[in-house]
Curated annotation (Swiss-Prot):
GO terms for cellular component: cytosol. This is Chaperone protein DnaJ 2. GO terms for molecular function: protein-folding chaperone binding; unfolded protein binding. Residues 69-133 are annotated as: Disordered.
Length: 307
């Protein structure tokens, strides 16, 4: 015969505890026995599981009523208040009333009352104890904010749920902003965990569908002469050959360096060129710019004189 677990005792609350009292006790115990606070402590880990199981039942009114029925039954329910002599009175587990004068089987009066009849008492003795139902699997939903690189690569991630549990889950790669993924049997009592992925802002990249947009600074000489420059991608630094005569704001494309779609095909990286002037040119650089000025034929203000 399977014994009914007393979740009130596990959480250290009375049977008539309010929902707020139950939550307060749960949070206190969850912090005390949390695996992060007690690493490699199997006893604390089991206690933490018991606390979560108890809170799952006691925080649900339907499950709590079912637990009360199995724990206390019809005749084993403990009294919560004294009864007046005029009331029917409560019954203790041995079939006698809690207080008041009673009539014995011989017809005499005594200081204790028997149950309503010997038949009632006999029926109580024959009552079958019902085994508790197995914990019902419950799905859990949670939000998870990740940096772009982590969402792209995937891997292990530790998450903390609102009920106090901490889980380490293996995340798949290529998760987009707003995507909802299912982690089997990571919920409560074997249910599933549904995670909504939110991507945190990135200092360099902006996700545009499966394309990744970024700005890349170049020097005046690189813009004029072209050549190979280094560009950061979510895979790391790559060499990119840019054409001569780059304009500020011009956009180039790095094929297959974007974010993957559901089929695993990657988008492109969109590179916007930003021509930057050296803030503190050296004397040699200044001399070269003077010589260029003497030789250059381009006048960007010529259009002002065309009117």
């Amino acid at each position: 015969m399977e014994q009914v677990r007393n979740y009130y005792q596990i959480l250290g609350v009375p049977r008539n505890a309010t929902a707020e009292e139950i939550k307060k006790s749960f949070r206190k115990l969850a912090r005390q026995y949390h695996p992060d606070v007690n690493p490699n402590d199997k006893t604390a880990e089991e206690k933490f599981k018991d606390i979560n199981e108890a809170y799952d039942v006691l925080s649900d009114e339907t499950k709590r009523r079912e637990l009360d029925s199995r724990l206390f039954g019809r005749f084993r329910r403990p009294p919560t208040s004294r009864f007046s002599p005029n009331s029917n009175g409560g019954r203790s587990p041995n079939g006698t009333s809690v207080n008041g004068q009673v009539r014995t089987p011989t017809g005499r009066t005594g200081t204790r009352q028997p149950a309503q009849s010997w038949q009632d008492f006999s029926e109580t003795r024959r009552t079958k104890v019902v085994s508790p139902a197995r914990p019902v699997p419950r799905d859990v939903e949670a939000n998870l904010t990740l940096p772009l690189e982590k969402a792209y690569r995937g891997g292990k991630e530790r998450i903390r749920l609102e009920d106090g549990r901490s889980l380490e889950v293996e995340m798949p790669g290529g998760m987009g902003d707003g995507q909802r993924i299912r982690l089997k049997q990571q919920g409560i009592n074997g249910g599933d965990l549904y995670l909504k992925i939110n991507l945190s802002p990135h200092p360099l990249f902006t996700l545009q569908g499966t394309d990744i947009a970024c700005q890349v600074p170049v020097t005046p000489s690189e813009a004029i002469l072209g050549g190979a420059i280094e560009v950061m991608t979510i895979d790391g630094l790559v060499k990119m050959t840019v054409p001569a005569g780059l304009k500020n704001g011009q956009k180039l494309r790095l094929a297959k360096k974007g974010f993957p779609n559901n089929q695993g095909d990657r988008g492109d990286q969109l590179v916007e060129i930003r021509v930057e002037i050296p803030p503190e040119p050296s004397p040699e650089e200044l001399e070269l710019y003077r010589r260029i000025r003497e030789k250059e034929t381009f006048n960007p203000r010529q259009k002002f004189f065309d009117f």
